[in-house]
Amino acid sequence: MTAALWPATLHHLRRDSPEAERLARFYGELLGDRVEALPGGEWLVAGRGRMLVVGKGAKCAVPYFALEMRDAAQLGAYRRELEQRGTAIEPSPSPLFAPGAFAVADPDGRRVVFGLPASASGTEGKTVARLQHFVCASTQLENMLAFYRDRLGLVESDRVLEDGALAAAFLRSDPEHHSFAAFRAPESRPDHHSYETGSWNDIRDWGDRMASLRIPLWWGPGRHGPGNNLFFMIEDPEGHKVEFSAELELVPRETAFRTWPHEQRTLNLWGSAWMRS
């Protein structure tokens, strides 16, 4: 991986909707977070360790996700490494990062933003669940893996194979098992984003919160093979999947990737699984 990328953590992402305010208020209620209007018609949902930008656009779209670097020196060194490789650098689309942030486009056209927060991340709120990873589905999974691993410098943690063909790839930008992953699918689209809680008891408490809001669990509870984390998922009003996770595996930077078979047990050691392809 590039020397300058490690560590980087998911700071925020943008979720688009034809009804941006309605979706922002759903997430505010879901997470118990404050909701505020931003310039340009965007909305901010901010809480303890998590920030979400909601904008007007196509249903379920995630036009970018944003990784926070350690400091300005790391950000500058990383940009220089990318430029030396001939990577096209674009202006940052994020209203939450300070000047100096920049973006690159992945093979599916989604922007990955790198930068530093313009202000402190949310610290208010009683509910514990920090924004931790984003996952997409893609029709060109091999190209996506090559881009994120070889061009951007994320470290491959696990891959899933079906008859020798790549079915999923999990990559990390810090010791947590994955900050980004991609699945092979018939169409390229967002898959889910995930909030990491502290323990199994937190998963229970978030499940109880879903019950109080009359939001049914869509998948889980269960335990993933890659990452070994406890989880459940719900759907937001547009069908985008939202995961609550605990005990995600920590993987040293130098650890080589593992290979898993494409089967239900890989995605859920406890039972049935959501098979993307």
Stretches found by the model and what they are:
Residues 1-21, 62-67, 118-142, 155-158, ...:
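N-terminal beta-strand motif that seeds the catalytic metal site of vicinal oxygen chelate
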Residues 151-154, 173-177, 196, 203-216:
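Short hydrophobic alpha-helical module
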Residues 23-28, 82, 109, 144, ...:
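Conserved active-site tyrosine of GNAT-family acetyltransferases
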Residues 31-64, 68-69, 110-118, 159-191, ...:
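Conserved short beta-strand elements that form part of the metal-binding/catalytic scaffold
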Residues 1-3, 9-18, 57-81, 83-130, 135, 169-171, ...:
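Vicinal oxygen chelate
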Residues 2-50, 96, 100, 136-178:
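Core segments of cupin and vicinal oxygen chelate
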